[in-house]
Structures are given as structure tokens and as C-alpha cells.
């Protein structure tokens, strides 16, 4: 990082106020003042009072198998690493990965709408059951493999497919809601 940048981790902003020509962010442990602020907080931009009722809070879910045994790798065959990624952000992704963590398969194919941005354990349990079925349908020859981890992640979509991006007020910018294509669209938007 540049010597002109200070990094404050685990410092949630509780308030953001315009003080003169600067912006002041209040955290549980203090205040940070800056002339310019970029809110890169995805769907949490609504908690700052912007883009109210224009964003959809979706969670997508993935699961990863346990390490494949040498026999399972032989049964699966093919290349050690491959992936199928959909053009639709909510489509199914399947990847075979290899590395320090062993040979595994990752599947992602479920989503839920969570306007409160807080999915619960029963949702994750339902997703796991769905992933187990999807995995066994796609890889019937690997019926003994278990899914070792299942997780979810927040994906913000806008109602009009436009990013929540730009200058909100003098010195206050938003870089939020990339509609499922964060790396690509975030780079394009600067």
C-alpha cells in the first residue's frame, strides 16, 4: 500500500457524515476523516441511505467434495482441472480443482432471495440436499463421495441491471452492485 493509505480492518462504519468539506466515518473505536470516500459495500449501500428499493439481495451457494481418492480420480478420468461456468450469473458452475487441498469437485447452482441479507441454517441445509442430488445426478459413477463444505455468498442485483456506481454527493462515491459480474464490471466502471 502507498504510504498515503491507512488500512483499518474489522472497523465497521456505524455513521458517515459530511463535516465541512470532509467526510467523517464513525467506527466503534474511533473516527476516520477523508475528503473523498468510496463506498464499496455491495448491497449494504442501502444501509447508508442510497439506492433504497432498487437492489435485490440474492445469495448463491456452493459445495465442495471431500478429497478424491486415487481410485475416484481414475473413475472420473479426464483433465486434473476444468470448469464449466454459465453466462447467466445464477446458472450452474461445476469445477474440478487440484492442488494442495487435493483433487476435488466444486458445484454451485442454487440461489435464494434474502432481502434482510441474512440467510439462515435451514436454507443452507436445503441447499446441501440439493447439491447432493445435483452431484449424484451429474456424477453417478462417484456415488461414495461426500460434500465436505457448503457455503453461501451475497450477490446484489439491481432492478434495472445497472451498477450502483458513481458520485452520490460531492466527495462521496459508490462502487457497488456489479450484478453478478464483479471483477469484469467493477474494472470497467473504474
List each language-model region with its residue ranges.
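Secondary-structure boundary/capping motif
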Residues: 17, 157, 182-186
Amino acid at each position: 500500500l502507498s504510504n498515503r493509505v491507512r488500512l483499518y480492518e474489522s472497523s465497521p462504519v456505524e455513521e458517515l457524515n459530511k463535516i465541512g468539506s470532509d467526510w467523517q466515518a464513525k467506527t466503534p473505536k474511533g473516527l476516520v476523516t477523508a475528503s473523498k470516500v468510496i463506498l464499496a459495500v455491495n448491497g449494504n449501500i442501502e444501509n447508508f441511505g442510497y439506492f433504497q428499493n432498487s437492489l435485490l439481495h440474492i445469495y448463491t451457494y456452493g459445495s465442495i467434495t471431500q478429497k478424491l481418492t486415487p481410485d475416484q480420480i481414475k473413475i472420473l478420468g479426464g483433465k486434473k482441472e476444468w470448469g464449466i461456468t454459465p453466462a447467466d450469473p445464477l446458472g450452474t458452475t461445476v469445477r474440478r480443482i487440484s492442488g494442495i487441498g487435493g483433487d476435488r469437485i466444486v458445484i454451485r447452482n442454487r440461489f435464494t432471495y434474502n432481502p434482510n441479507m441474512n440467510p439462515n441454517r435451514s436454507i443452507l441445509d436445503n441447499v446441501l440436499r440439493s447439491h447432493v442430488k445435483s452431484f449424484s445426478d451429474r456424477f453417478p459413477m462417484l456415488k461414495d463421495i461426500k460434500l465436505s463444505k457448503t457455503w453461501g455468498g451475497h450477490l446484489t442485483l439491481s432492478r434495472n441491471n445497472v451498477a450502483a456506481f458513481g458520485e452520490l454527493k460531492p466527495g462521496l462515491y459508490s462502487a457497488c452492485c456489479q450484478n453478478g459480474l464483479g471483477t469484469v464490471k467493477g474494472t470497467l466502471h473504474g
